[in-house]
Amino acid sequence: MTGDPPVRRRLVGGALRRYREAIGYMLEDAARILECDRSKISRIETGQRGIRPKELRELLTEYGVPAGEQSALVAIAGRGGRSSWWHSYPGIVTDTYLDYAIMESAASEIMAYEAQLVPDLLQTDEYTGAIAAAEPGDRTGQQRDDAVAAQAARRQAVLGGGRRIGVVLGEGALHQAVGGAGVLAGQIGHLVKLSAECPALTIQVLPFSAGAHAAAGAGSLAILRFPDAPGLGVAHLGAVSGGVYLESQDDVSRYLRAFALLRASALSPADSDRMLRGLAR
């Protein structure tokens, strides 16, 4: 049995289908634009095959899709420029990881919730290394070091990109002694520093006192939204290297509502900062 098509293909293909249907085009009409048979269009729309940037632009232009939305889809469908951080870590970045990395780099807004761990984008190298060392498997010390370096490159690229990032962090993550007390203390201090230095980053702590909440039972949630493309989005449950992707508009809307409820249940950014500073002392 074959697996599901890659999430980036599903996201782009689903968008193409919606745009085509919105203007009343049939598969045959789209096929005439690319001078191909209708089966190729069908496979593209269902994510069974990819599409070249030139062909993607041709379809999007014919469908009347605004330029900003076109650019977002082309970025999602591509593999990034030569300077993209993931090209330096081919042995670490799996196909699944690459899908997420490319979508993350194209996103204009990232929303993340973690119950027990500090999210990847906010971790120190020491914290990341402690997690890597605890994972099952037979990775060598060098491979773990490379994984930490890849994560650091990813953080630098994403945090330095000016995109909005909203994080809701379970209070338990501030007490889970990943790597020991010293590593945890350094990690909390790093959160305080990031909060002060990154104006596009908002950190909120979901306190133990919040009780049951909109993400109860979910350990990890990330939502990506894209510039000038209100109909595009991806919700991801689980680790970057695996997990489940949901890209339908209904699913993304449901998780956006859940994240809004999480934010409402969490401490305000100011109160969260005070908690972090108190723990960092």
Could you describe each region identified by the protein language model?
Residues T2-R18, A22, E28-R32, T46, ...:
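Interdomain hinge/linker segments and adjacent boundary elements that couple functional modules
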Residues Y25, C36-D37:
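The short coil/loop that forms the "turn" connecting the two helices of the helix-turn-helix
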Residues G180-R281:
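C-terminal regulatory/effector modules of DNA-binding transcriptional regulators
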